Amino acid sequence: PAEKTLPEFTEWEIEAERVEPRLVAITQPHSTYCEEYRSLRTHVLHKSQTKKLQAIVVASTNPSEGKSITAINLAWMLAQTDGVKCLIIDSDLRMPSLADYLGIETEKGLSDILAGTCSVKDAIIKLAPANLHILPGGEARSDVAELISGPKFKEILREVRDMFDYVIIDAPPLGIFTDATVLINQADGAMLVVRAGRTRYSAVTRVLESIPRERMLGVVLNQS
């Protein structure tokens, strides 16, 4: 495919000491923990060779399973791949957390675009030095299901697909909200993050049944 040309975005320099320590792709890039995310990146790149895999939802059954941490680490690793342009979207609009984890301050985000108060270009931030781009969540909202299900989100996804090779979508918990299912149906693939020793097997099974099999990339076991 032809190389994608990106517009100029606001840039933010990431400082390792300000980010969430579990973002090992940033804080411990040479550790064995980070190696697990390299393996996950390899899995995604390998799958991409045989099927369209551009927009990927990272979801969990319940809150606090590590899906946002997994999404950022994966996106950071993809962005460091030669020639790959990657965007991560915070679509967990009831509790947006990606900007806080990364130690960045944002004024606009996905909720503002959905509300029609800013453009996609104005809300995306380029994170140096990894070349990862982020579309933060913006202001927390309660009418998320309606916004995510509407035509505006489809437009946003179409627009960012034209700009980036990979779009990683941090979704709300699947076991609680319907938004994640809507997101998965608009994406090309999904992975489920499960916290070891915490998530009930029955809950995971129930959630997996709600994900179309052809979109399921696998289950990520979070040991932290």
Which ranges hold each PLM region?
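P-loop NTP-binding module
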Residues: P1-S224
